[in-house]
Amino acid sequence: MENKGKLIVLEGACDGVGKSTQLELLESELSKDTECKRWHFPSYGFASSDMVRLFLKGKLGKLDEIPDEVIESYYAIDREYVWRNYLKKYYAEGKTILLDRYTTSSFIYQTLKCKTEDEKKDMIAKMKAYEYYNLGIGEPDLVIFFNGDFDTLTKLRLARENNAGIQKDIFEASVDTQRKIYESAQFVSEYLKWDTVNVTEGNAMRSKEDIHQDVMKLVRKLR
């Protein structure tokens, strides 16, 4: 597959870092002079994400009961279907694809049970080989990792969820699980050398405009 387009992924250290907002701002800015295609994974509303939806609701078993490779396959099926049917053609035409989550999320979540760094690295290598080479989906040209202080992000996220009455999924059930995800994200982002944007300052979120400026600096380097 000829690499003509650009594949930009926005990933976060945990929930509540503002990826969706930054994706909208990025699309708005880039659309001024280039064609963009935006997508959010998992692809809820598409049959390809049905297993993911059931898994996150706890319908397929408890988190510690399901092998990592099986969980990975739920997400990989969704990504492969969407890439083959919706994104591949845009990429081949030289357009910019903007993704909220991607294989990057699996690297973070599916290494949670790994006990050593070597096990984490081995798991990541297997997932990369499976999805990028066996399934043939696109490999990111740029991964922007939104990071911040865990306690600040958790406090703000819980306040939003309580006000909105949001139902938590299998990964969001406890702060302890969220902390493990956060710690996994720190390792993966450093190991894979993702470009980092900090979204907190002190005990508060930075403004979305300031964060957007940092994002644009990274994207301009790619272009």
Feature names for model-found ranges:
Residues 12, 146, 199:
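Catalytic metal- and UDP-sugar-binding loop of GT-A-like glycosyltransferases, i.e.
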Residues 104-183:
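A glycine- and Lys/Arg-enriched "phosphate-lid" helix/loop adjacent to the NTP-binding pocket
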Residues 7, 11, 96, 137, ...:
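Hydrophobic "anchor" residues on beta-strands that sit immediately upstream
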Residues 7, 36-38, 143-145, 194-196:
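Conserved beta-strand scaffold positions in the cores of enzyme catalytic domains, especially
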Residues 2-28:
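Walker A (P-loop) phosphate-binding motif
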Residues 34-129, 134-135:
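ATP-dependent small-molecule kinase phosphotransfer cores
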Residues 2, 27, 151-223:
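NTP-dependent small-molecule kinase module
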Residues 1-2, 137:
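Short, flexible hinge/linker loops that cap or flank conserved catalytic cores
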